[in-house]
Amino acid sequence: MVMRKILIVLCSLLLLFSCKKQEKDAAEIVGKTAKIYYDYLLHNNYEAFVDGSFRPDSIPPSYREQLIANAKMFIGQQKEEHLGIKEITISNATIDTLHHTGNAFLLFSYGDKTTEQVIVPMVERKGVWYMR
């Protein structure tokens, strides 16, 4: 009887820790995906950055062009205010597996030696993570 209780407790603990590992791995994917999207932006691939945003429906080409222009203006503003973004690293990432959402915490390192943490809300659709 005691052996059975110990076995149940051990199995429960094993299950608990295996779920945490899976959640951690999924959160890591959220962080890496957000970094990839922002690396596109950093390397002037504005189209890929814009395509990394979730939209339930297609958007008109004129609106897509406006989003691309906004991304270019953002990079221009960062160059003007901080001498540009020099590096993007992942600080942390969290995930809500029930709602298929997550947050990536990216650290921007600027040319003027300042840093800024940026939170990137993410959403998963059909196995792909997108920026919200």
Question: Across the structure, where does each feature detected by a protein language model lie?
Answer:
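Sec-dependent bacterial lipoprotein signal peptides
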Residues: 1-19
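Short, compositionally biased low-complexity segments
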Residues: 5, 41-46
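Small side chains
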Residues: 12, 34, 102-104
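Short, low-complexity N-terminal intrinsically disordered segments enriched in polar/charged residues
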Residues: 18-43
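Short solvent-exposed beta->alpha transition segments
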Residues: 31-32, 46-99
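N-terminal non-globular leader segments, chiefly Sec-dependent signal peptides
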Residues: 39-42, 51-57, 102-107
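Exposed beta-sheet edge and beta->alpha loop/turn motif
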Residues: 87-132
